[in-house]
């Protein structure tokens, strides 16, 4: 009898592990309604707008080895597709890519990318646009889509890197109060831009938190930190990220419009840290996480794609987390898209993008964002790229 009970227990454990550790396969369009995707932000989401906005003819992202994994440079800062492309594919947008808004003649019926490299929340970026300018451009184009279609479509935002990189360069000795004041200024402007989008009919928001900026290869190289991250930038990113969830909670709770306010927060900061942390990166099959695949310098972080720079190129980009000094390889981008779309509640809350799409428009959210250090895991982690190591 004891042996039988032990056998049942073992089988039960195996069943649980099988359920929660089998890879989640996202089938494009499966059970997902027809919605559009609109993206706003900087080079991480730029689908090629910088190419059409800039007067320069030698932009590095238009030259090999950018686009290497897709056989051609496509104006994106990666060896292939970026996160919005994978999300577009998951929701069956034609060709599985999101077109840049500045490219003439593109089909914008299922959405478009307003993101531009070098974009910021504050200031006046050269040959780029602030987030507010991107939102105003959407406002001017709004008549291309029905109001009811806009209400159920996705609005993805990733921006802020330029603001904090520029602040750190200009204020290397800024004290805590100066840092806090700057973060507050950035967040207030971001809040106004999201409020403007909301007033234009957007109701489903996906906000991606900032990466650990101090761990970018270009930052390690410029600040000569070796294998360590530059903590001042990481601290600024953490301060910024900590204000996003409460801000979106407030929007959702005070919404009075008939279409409501619903959102998803992607904790990109911790998703990245998992993959670049010493001793854990191999669990995700990333063998090089502190230097770039393409570039020159101590961390191969500068000059990728520039004709006047004899940059190095790694032999196998899928073993690298970073493709250039600031941007991820297609492999890393795809992992992030899967996490965001339907996987890991540790880094995506209060719901995944897939859940957000099908959530009834106008319905009050049943769950809200919670700080990670206080949140109780509602479901086992589904970061299947980590496998058994996800249980820690």
Curated annotation (Swiss-Prot):
Cellular component, GO annotation: apoplast; chloroplast; chloroplast envelope; cytosol; cytosolic ribosome; nucleus; peroxisome; plant-type vacuole
Give its E.C. classification number.
Answer: 3.1.1.-
Is Lipid metabolism among the key words of this record? yes
Which residues are annotated as active site?
43 (nucleophile), 324, 327
Q: Which biological processes are named by the entry's GO terms? A: glucosinolate catabolic process; lipid catabolic process; response to insect
- Localization: Secreted
Source superkingdom: Eukaryota
Q: What happens when the gene is disrupted?
A: In cv. Columbia, altered ratio of endogenous nitrile to isothiocyanate hydrolysis products.
**GO MF term set:** hydrolase activity, acting on ester bonds
> Family assignment?
Belongs to the 'GDSL' lipolytic enzyme family.
Write the protein's name: GDSL esterase/lipase ESM1
Name of the coding gene: ESM1
């Amino acid at each position: 009898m004891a042996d039988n009970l032990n056998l049942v227990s073992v089988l039960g454990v195996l069943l649980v592990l099988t359920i929660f550790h089998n890879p989640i396969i996202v089938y494009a369009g499966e059970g997902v309604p027809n919605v559009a995707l609109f993206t706003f932000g900087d080079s991480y989401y730029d689908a090629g707008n910088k190419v059409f906005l800039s007067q320069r003819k030698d932009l590095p992202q238009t030259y090999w080895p950018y686009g290497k994994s897709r056989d051609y440079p496509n104006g994106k800062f990666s060896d292939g597709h970026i996160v919005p492309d994978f999300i577009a594919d998951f929701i069956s947008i034609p060709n599985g890519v999101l077109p840049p808004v500045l490219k003439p003649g593109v089909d914008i019926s299922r959405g478009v990318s307003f993101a531009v490299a070098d974009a910021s929340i504050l200031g006046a970026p050269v040959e780029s646009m602030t987030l507010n300018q991107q939102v105003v451009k959407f406002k001017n184009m709004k008549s291309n889509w029905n109001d009811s279609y806009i209400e159920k479509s996705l609005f993805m935002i990733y921006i802020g890197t330029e603001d904090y990189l520029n602040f750190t360069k200009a204020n290397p000795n800024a004290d805590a109060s100066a840092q806090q004041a700057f973060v507050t200024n950035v967040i207030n402007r971001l809040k106004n831009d999201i409020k403007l989008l909301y007033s234009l009919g957007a109701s489903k928001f996906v906000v991606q938190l900032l990466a650990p900026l101090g761990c970018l290869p270009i930052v390690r190289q410029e600040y000569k930190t070796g294998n360590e991250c530059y903590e001042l930038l990481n601290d600024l990113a953490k301060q910024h990220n900590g204000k996003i969830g409460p801000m979106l909670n407030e929007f959702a709770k005070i919404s009075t419009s008939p279409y409501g306010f619903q959102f998803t927060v992607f904790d990109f900061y911790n998703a990245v840290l998992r993959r670049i942390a010493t001793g854990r990166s191999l669990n995700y099959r990333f063998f090089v996480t502190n230097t770039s695949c393409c570039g020159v310098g101590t961390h191969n972080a500068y000059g990728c794609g520039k004709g006047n720079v004899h940059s190095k190129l790694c032999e196998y980009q899928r073993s690298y987390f970073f493709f250039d000094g600031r941007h991820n390889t297609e492999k890393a981008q795809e992992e992030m898209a899967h996490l965001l779309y339907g996987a890991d509640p540790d880094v995506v809350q209060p719901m995944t993008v897939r859940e957000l799409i099908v959530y009834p428009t106008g319905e009050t959210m049943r769950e809200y964002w919670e700080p990670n250090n206080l949140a109780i895991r509602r479901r086992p982690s589904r970061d299947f790229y980590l496998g058994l190591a996800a249980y820690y």
